[in-house]
């Protein structure tokens, strides 16, 4: 299994357990879904189950979460257009600097494709939710979430040059 980590923070962001689709040679999209998870452990210290509250047998202690957000402990964050532009300029500059060291021939392709993709994001800015990795590093990748055309299926967007893969 391949685990994809943020090149800046080292946070685990996604794995190949999710079907990653490369888009415009700049990002990966991963479909995800809403799932119900049980909070805490299933602890029963009572000797007589009939003496326990009937309510405990209900869906108490469960919550519906995005499976990718939950699995990789991503945290929601928020941006307005102006603050996102400020963030993305700094982020792209950091990724470009890393590429110049590790893969200089990729830099022109990255710049061209990144500009085009950021324009797409800004054109539909209100449709996106934003998430950051577990370390909450403000300089690291902000993962985008949107919904497919069906309005039901969520998908996450990761800048491919901001990820490093590791066999797990």
UniProtKB/Swiss-Prot annotation:
Location within or outside the cell: Cytoplasm
UniProt keyword Phosphoprotein, yes or no: yes
Pfam families: TCTP (PF00838)
Keywords, ordered alphabetically: Calcium, Chaperone, Cytoplasm, Phosphoprotein
Keyword Phosphoprotein: yes
Residues modified as Phosphoserine: 78
Example of a GO MF term: calcium ion binding
Domain TCTP: 1-168
An annotated GO cellular component: nucleus
Gene Ontology annotations of biological process type: cytoplasmic translation
Domain of life: Eukaryota
Function in brief: Involved in calcium binding and microtubule stabilization. May be a guanine nucleotide-free chaperone (GFC).
Family, per entry: Belongs to the TCTP family.
Name of the featured protein: Translationally-controlled tumor protein homolog
Gene symbol of the encoding locus: p23fy
